[in-house]
A protein has these predicted regions:
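Surface-exposed assembly/interface segments
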Residues: 1-222
Length: 222
């Protein structure tokens, strides 16, 4: 009986199924995305955005488990997470300049130096934090507090040690603007040509897909 000597390599199939890339039946999905998670939310509005992986899609348009509010997140989950189909073109019509709500002086009670805002989709650049006692001056981001998202897409305020928030159970007044997906209408989906910028919006952006990506739309979801 012979024995194997030396180093040998054997490979096993991974349990992760990579996306199957297709050139026919390209999915083009219109809907709403939590673009507040992006550095520049306006960069992902009424613009065809292509993604080949789950991670790429999340980095380009954001992700939320609230599929009722953010419909493109469901497309990400189904296309990449369940069926493994790529690429997908996403067109977000939720515009933070239009579809938004303002909140003034929401009282946020900290617990252990942390507190969560009551609305998701918060636009970070709009956040103003003050102490609840009297007319104290505003607190400074990254000096007195930091902002972060929890697993459900809500914004968490955390006091920074050495900052002006000295009590771990302090109450803060927070004013901010958040996305309002409910303000998106069928007219935003249908779109057209902007009379001022002459740019395509909504479904009119279908005609931009082939010139941008050299791929022909096959399935349209809205």
């Amino acid at each position: 009986m012979g024995y194997r000597h030396g180093i040998y390599i054997s490979e096993l199939a991974t349990s992760i199924t990579p996306p199957v890339q297709v050139s026919a039946g390209l999915i083009v999905a219109f809907g709403t995305a939590p673009v507040n998670q992006l550095e520049d939310p306006a960069s992902a509005v009424n613009k065809p955005i292509i993604a080949y992986t789950y991670a790429e899609a999340v980095s380009k348009i954001g992700y939320s488990t609230n599929f009722e509010k953010y419909t493109l997140s469901e497309v990400i989950k189904v296309a990449f997470g369940i069926y493994g189909v790529a690429p997908v073109v996403f067109i977000n019509v939720l515009d933070p300049a239009k579809h938004k709500k303002d909140v003034t002086d929401e009282l946020v009670k900290l617990s252990g130096g942390k507190g969560t805002l009551s609305n998701d989709g918060v636009l970070y650049k709009s956040v103003v934090v003050k102490k609840a006692d009297g007319d104290s001056p505003g607190l400074t981001l990254d000096t007195d507090y930091v902002l972060a998202l929890d697993d459900n897409g809500y914004t968490v305020i955390t006091a920074i040690s050495g900052g002006k928030i000295t009590e771990k159970d302090a109450t803060l007044k927070v004013s901010y603007t958040h996305l309002d997906p409910g303000a998106v209408t069928k007219n935003d989906i249908i779109g057209g040509v902007d009379s001022n910028t002459k740019a395509n919006t909504g479904l009119e952006l279908l005609s931009d897909v082939y010139p941008r990506f050299k791929l022909v739309p096959g399935q349209v979801i809205a």
